Amino acid sequence: IIVTIIAIMAHTLSMTARPYCDVRKFSIVDGLAANTISDMKQAPDRLMWFGTWNGLSYYDGYSFYTFRDVPGGEDVLSSNRIIAIYPTARNNVWCVTSDRKIYLYSTHYCRFRNTEKSINEQFGINLKVDQLYPIKNGSTWITTKDGNYIIRAILSQEEEVSRELIKVGEHGLRSGKVWYIWGDQKGREWIFTEKGTTIYNHHFSTPLPFKWVREVGGNIFLATPDGKLAAFDEREKLIMIPMPKGDTRINQLNNTGYQPVN
């Protein structure tokens, strides 16, 4: 009897240990804008957004809702084919169309804003977007295909309020070929390029081309592809960390979840 009970308990435990997965398939029949999805992201409010070949969609757990230009309506988008999306800290969504133009979808007003046109008129340029980097403090960085400059846009709760075009050589920017732009817990905005690293509106700038960064317990660690590892201290100075002999490449930095003990 004891053996039987143990066997039943073991079987029950094995059953409860199995993860439950509810897999559902969605298509245009369910309200998705198109069956071809170019990008998908989750906004801070936990809504799932999808960039498709026929507009922008979001899913709230029950239904899909789609936003795009329609015949007879106001034409804002140069194309409904959206290839990349970037939710902001305030739950608006940047959209990049197939011709590399950018638009901001306001979730408050439920409309697209022709940001690309506004930027071109303000700075007298022909913007071709490469990547966007929304930062938690509300700013968004825009990098370009030609690499001659980058753009910093500040967003209010609903709309953009200011933009700044930064050319190579300004604000410590060493190159327009940007690897990554990142905001740390103190609100500092880091720009990582192929020719060096800088913090926007700070004195810190280094020719070391850091490509990876991790923040652990208030400490910031940086690494270059060619094997250089450093810590960033509160004086905004780099402390180089020796690597084991023979290690000449770093492919990534990972946070294991362990925190330093003070």
Regions found by a protein language model. Name each.
Residues 1-262:
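Carboxylate-rich, polar loop motifs that coordinate divalent cations or form catalytic acidic clusters
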